[in-house]
Amino acid sequence: MIKIAIDAMGGDFAPLEIVKGTLLALNKNTELQVFLYGNQKLITPLIEKTPFFGNKQIIIKHTPYFLGSADKNIRDQLKTTPNTSLFLALEAAKQDEVQGVVSAGATQTLILASHLILKKMPLMKRIAIAPMFNSFDNRTRILLDAGANTELKPQHLHTFANYATIIAKEILAIPNPQIKLLNIGTEPTKGRALELETYQLLSQDSNLNFGGNEEPQNLLTTSADILLSDGFTANIALKTYEGTMLNFMNHLKNILTKNFIKKIATKTLFQKPLQQLKNQIDPRQIGGAMLLGLNKIVIKAHGSSQSYAFCQAILQTQKLIKAQVNQKIANALEIAKNKENQTKKISTSTINPKTSETTKES
C-alpha cells in the first residue's frame, strides 16, 4: 500500500476539487491510502456527497489552519503556526508516515516549506520544478527548471539534465531520452553565458544524449524528451504553452457549438476526434510537476486544478514512488560524487621519478 499525504486546503478550488480528485484517484486504484490534511468540518461532507468505495483508504487529519496566497514569510509561519495543512503533510513525509506529498498551493510556498521540512538530498545543490507536458505527436516531455530558481549556474542545469534523464527512463519508459537546451537559436554560439557554458557541459557528458539547442516555437514538435532552461525562462515557456492550449480548446469549442446545427454536427461527426485532441494537448492530463532534489517525492499540482487534474497528480505521485525515482537519483548523485573525488585525486597526485629512484636506492 502506497501512502500519500494531501494538502486538502491548497489551491484555488480547495477543498472541494482536492477532495473530489482524491476520491477519483482512490476509486481508480486500490493500492493507495491517502491522508487528507485540512478542516474536517469542510472535508467530511464532501466525502459523503461523492461516490466512493474504499473507506479504509482515506484518513482525515484535522487542522483548521492553512496557508493562504497572502502568506509570504514561510519561515516565520513554520515557527508560529506549524500545524497548517501543508506543514503537517510535509512533516508526515519527514517522519516516514507517508511516501509522498501532493499540494496545489502556491509554488514558492511549497518549494520553501519542502526545503525547510524535508531538506534537499545530501548531494543536491538546488531544487528544480520538473513538469511534464503532452503535445500533438502523442509524446510526453519534461521541462525544467520551471520556476524554482530564476537564476542558475551551468553546473545546476547539468545536474538537472542527469536526473531528468532518470525520470524519463523510469516514468516515461524512454530508453535513451534526448535533452535539448531551450534557447533563442539552434547554433552553439547562441544565448547568454549560462546557455553557452551549459552547452559545453552537456556536450562533454557521455552519459547524456544531448541534442543541442531548441527554439521555443518547436516546443510541441521537438525531437527532445527533456527541455532544459533556468526557472525564469522555462516558467514563461510553460505558462505560454498552458494558456495557448486551453484558449485554443475553448475557442474551438465556441466555434463548433455556435448554433444548434453546429452543435448537432459536432456531436455526431467530431466528438471522438475532439476528445482525442483534448487528450493530446490538455495540460490537465499530466496533473503536476515534481520538485526534483528533495528527500521525499513532492508533487506540485496546478493551482487551478480541478478534480481530474488533481487525480492525475496523485496517480503521478504513486508512479514516481513505485519506480523508486528518489532512490535512483540519490544513487546517481553518489556515483557522480565518487567520480568527482577520483578525478580530484588523480589531478592532485604527482609522480616525481627522481624522488622515487632515490627512495629505491636508499
Swiss-Prot record:
<dbReference type="Pfam" id="PF02504">
    <property type="entry name" value="FA_synthesis"/>
</dbReference>
<dbReference type="GO" id="GO:0006633">
    <property type="term" value="P:fatty acid biosynthetic process"/>
</dbReference>
<protein>
    <recommendedName>
        <fullName>Phosphate acyltransferase</fullName>
        <ecNumber>2.3.1.274</ecNumber>
    </recommendedName>
</protein>
<dbReference type="InterPro" id="IPR003664">
    <property type="entry name" value="FA_synthesis"/>
</dbReference>
<dbReference type="GO" id="GO:0043811">
    <property type="term" value="F:phosphate:acyl-[acyl carrier protein] acyltransferase activity"/>
</dbReference>
<comment type="similarity">
    <text>Belongs to the PlsX family.</text>
</comment>
<keyword id="KW-0808">Transferase</keyword>
<feature type="compositionally biased region" description="Polar residues">
    <location>
        <begin position="344"/>
        <end position="356"/>
    </location>
</feature>
<keyword id="KW-0594">Phospholipid biosynthesis</keyword>
<keyword id="KW-0444">Lipid biosynthesis</keyword>
<comment type="function">
    <text>Catalyzes the reversible formation of acyl-phosphate (acyl-PO(4)) from acyl-[acyl-carrier-protein] (acyl-ACP). This enzyme utilizes acyl-ACP as fatty acyl donor, but not acyl-CoA.</text>
</comment>
<dbReference type="GO" id="GO:0008654">
    <property type="term" value="P:phospholipid biosynthetic process"/>
</dbReference>
<dbReference type="InterPro" id="IPR012281">
    <property type="entry name" value="Phospholipid_synth_PlsX-like"/>
</dbReference>
<comment type="pathway">
    <text>Lipid metabolism; phospholipid metabolism.</text>
</comment>
<keyword id="KW-1208">Phospholipid metabolism</keyword>
<dbReference type="GO" id="GO:0005737">
    <property type="term" value="C:cytoplasm"/>
</dbReference>
<feature type="region of interest" description="Disordered">
    <location>
        <begin position="343"/>
        <end position="362"/>
    </location>
</feature>
<comment type="subunit">
    <text>Homodimer. Probably interacts with PlsY.</text>
</comment>
<keyword id="KW-0963">Cytoplasm</keyword>
<keyword id="KW-0443">Lipid metabolism</keyword>
